[in-house]
Amino acid sequence: MSRVLSAIVGAGTTADQGADPPAPARATVAEAAPAYPEFRVEVERFADVRILRYRVPGFEALDARTKKLVYCLYEAALCGREITYDQKYRYNLSVKRTLEQIARSYPGDRDTADFRALTLYLKRVWFANGIHHHYGHDKFRPEFSASAFAAFVRGTPAEFPLRERQSLEDFIAELTRVIFDPGVDAKLVSKSADHDVLTSSAVNFYSDLTQPEVEAFYAKQAVEGAEARVSLGLNSRLVKVDGVPTEQVQKVGGRYTEAIERIVAWLEAAALCAENEAQHAALKKLIRFYRTGSLEDWDDYNIAWVRDTESHVDVVNGFIEVYNDPLGMRGTFESVVSFRDPEATRRIGTIAAAAQWFEDHMPFFGRHKKESVTGISGKAITVVIESGDASPTTPIGINLPNSDWIRREHGSKSVTLANVVAAYNAVRGGVDREFSFGPAEIQRNERYGELAATLHVDLHEVIGHGSGQLERGVGPLHETLKNYGSTLEEARADLVALYFAVDPKLVELGLMPSVEVGYAAYDQFIRNALLQQLNRVELGKDLEEDHMRNRQLIAAWAYEHGLKDNVIERRTRDGKTFFVVNDHAKLRSLFGQLLRELQRIKSTGDYAAIRELVERYAVKVDPALHAEVRARYAALDVPAYAGFVGPRLVPVLRGEEIVDVRIEYPDDFTAQMLEYADRYAFLPAWN
């Protein structure tokens, strides 16, 4: 056991069981008072991204026990970070570790075009948790040559992750094909209706299986008509063993055990520092899930986690979101460690308290509304650290758990990541002004845009995802709507937020000063969906990512259905295209109509209807408009994406006792990634 973990748990506690976490950086009491220079939010740019930092206001005010709790959860989060790499692609860890060895140890000339290009490629791999773009899902195209790569490997005096009995030359040849051949595993996640989505996707959730084989396998496991069912496949990889589909479960003693044992050790330590019994019970149930791999235990944990609404500190840790699975079943590892932001929580808490009113006033068919909304809680959080699929890019809002039956019977938690949103707002620049048409739209956005965006996230997470109900006997989205389920669910939640954005109820609740805030939200959404988000797609490519598809589905559908009344107008000025909302009230009506239809599709499992909507409105891009948007962004010099360097927590020791935890704000992305690679590389390169 590491000295720091021993200082938290003491000898002979349950956290002694399992693997020893690595010894973290630590400080003595004399070193515990850092002096920070002026805080820079943006610290670096490369490729199509910029690297930001966020502050963690309020951390220093936490008491010592709470800081120890946060520190244990921080370590548990980072111990699982490399699981995400392997889940996304079977070669990610071998490529990543090879490039890291070159970056650390190559003794030759580093001031060459090839070495600079290799360094850039490695940064992109770190940013995406793999060799495919984190948003567009296309494989990166290296700007260094295959021969240069081979020379770098041969010339670096370091150990590389060779397979058993593999020669260095064979290893180089294998990775060269993976990195440089554009036809090999070109797309991380393919959701095209024209192909088998499994055989055309590089993601590492399945091996040697077709989409029909997987669907048949889980159809046999599903209980006909059951409503309270586990999330089949969530924490496993499905492979063929002797021709039979077999799940490799991710748990202690199973797949990824080397990392999961460390996660469990730190969660055990965290449980000893728990704030209250509810938090302690939830952490113990999470530990049990990691030990057993049982999805019933996962449900038990989620129920306990939803019930813990009083704790100041919170954590998401597990196999959570299913966006990286083309079938929408398997969760990618992520963790978010946070504590409550009391000031911002008052706003989101007001929305949560009115959840029944919102449900009653949904434009759904009556049978698709919940008669009684249960256990909706909402808060704004201050993020301490994120890892796995939540880092370096991060959500700005979270609503969990994803299980419909747990939401219905036990409720859900919704959070807004307040300090992350603040960091984004600090670097917004002139993008909104570039794509806004006239003075009224610009002034409205400058006055209300930040509040409009915040309320949209709150309504999306707190009300949107938790709204509505399935008709009796209808299965979960991955069974009924398959590869279109995630797009529908994100569109449904966005439409809920949009539908209520201009409702006077928000003024009555004190959430906004006037419906002009809602008008700003409509302007923002249409600008982003029909113009701004196109900057995130390479020319000639379709939309693949679920959030992008959802936005274009909504906006393109509303534009087409409002043409007769000129609700949204396409205008041109100085050779630039704009989409202008002329009638916000009629646009709200259109949003309500589409929301009713999407809820009907979800509630009834109408696959044909969602396929028609997505393929008609959400996939294809106007090539001329696409090129125009890319050119306008290039002139602005604003990268399409942003991610974060995370804070570092350093335990402060007096002898063997932790007396404090210090927070530091690193500003070097490469240094942090190499530090993480040194401290948290628990998994074999080949799994």
Predicted regions and their residues:
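N-terminal-proximal low-complexity accessory segments that begin disordered
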Residues: 34-98
